[in-house]
């Protein structure tokens, strides 16, 4: 995977933006040692988390038709962002297919 693909990741979920952002804050606070990150800035559509050595993690959640589009951006915490995304309930295939038509 190229560095660009690791620094900006995207997924969709059935959770609301508020649920996604709350889950991100909880997820990154539970990480151990150098992979913990804590809220620095928040809005209704994003949260910026700051970790060890000043590493920044930005999670954005934008509502859509029956889904929430979630993006994550970071330079060093790419594996943790991917793990967080794996905890989010995916959009059922039928909903995803109908939205694309």
What is the role of each PLM region?
Residues 1-37:
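Terminal, regulation- and interaction-focused segments at domain boundaries
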Residues 7-9, 47, 70:
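Hydrophobic residues positioned within well-ordered beta-strands of beta-sheet architectures
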Residues 33, 39, 93-97:
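Short glycine-aromatic motifs
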Residues 2-3, 39-41, 51, 62:
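A generic structural signal for short, solvent-exposed coil/turn residues
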Residues 7, 45, 55-57:
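Residue-level marker for the onset of beta-strands and adjacent loop->beta junctions
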Residues 49-101:
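Beta-strand/loop substructures that line and gate deep hydrophobic ligand-binding cavities in soluble
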Residues 27-30, 46-53:
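Short, solvent-exposed secondary-structure boundary motifs
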Residues 34-48:
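Short Gly/Thr-rich strand-loop-strand
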